[in-house]
Swiss-Prot record:
Annotated transmembrane regions: none
Domain Globin: residue ranges: 1-45, 55-194
Binding site for heme b: 150
InterPro entries from the UniProt entry: Globin, Globin-like_sf, Globin/Proto, Mb-like_M
Keyword Transport: yes
Keyword Lipid metabolism: no
Source lineage: Eukaryota, Metazoa, Ecdysozoa, Arthropoda, Crustacea
PANTHER family: GLOBIN-LIKE PROTEIN
Protein name listed in UniProt: Extracellular globin-E1
Organism, as annotated: Artemia sp.
Family to which this protein belongs: Belongs to the globin family.
Assembly and binders: Artemia hemoglobin is a dimer of two similar sized subunits. Each subunit represents a globin chain which exists in two forms (alpha and beta), thus making possible three different phenotypes (HB1, alpha(2), HB2, alpha/beta, HB3, beta(2)). The globin chain is a polymer of eight heme-binding covalently linked domains.
Amino acid sequence: DISHFQNFRVTLLEYLTENGMNGAQKASWNKAFDAFEKYIIMGLSSLERVDPITGLSGLEKNAILDTWGKVRGNLQEVGKATFGKLFAAHPEYQQMFRFFQGVQLAFLVQSPKFAAHTQRVVSALDQTLLALNRPSDQFVYMIKELGLDHINRGTDRSFVEYLKESLGDSVDEFTVQSFGEVIVNFLNEGLRQA
């Protein structure tokens, strides 16, 4: 919001005037502030611009990456918590995995095979999210590939819902909407293309 900068500008110029700034100096300051304001507006415009391929604005990309950055240092725990909640809510999904079939969830979440699988999945998601700031076609390709990889397993979008739940307080409503608008859409597109 440019109004914060504009209020700062007025306040600083008043202070400088009270402390001896002359008319020529004030004109120079105003010229400098005009240039700063122009670049701030350009930067804000680029954050609001929507990428035609992903459908995400720069603000939405930043919201997703900020949230992910809060949990990125503990990806294994994010994966284990997400899959644990997913399997608790949808036991039939657990049965899709040969190594997980017939294992009680309480034991499964302590299993090295479970930890390895969740680490692979969340690492793939991590790489995909980091591609948000790369060329959009690469991001779209990665998301569609994730969707295609899971169609044969009968996977749906439930994983994303439980991922949001696992991220907890680090996810605000804006970020949830940003995830929902693009990630789920591209995963579903990948699933449809299979």
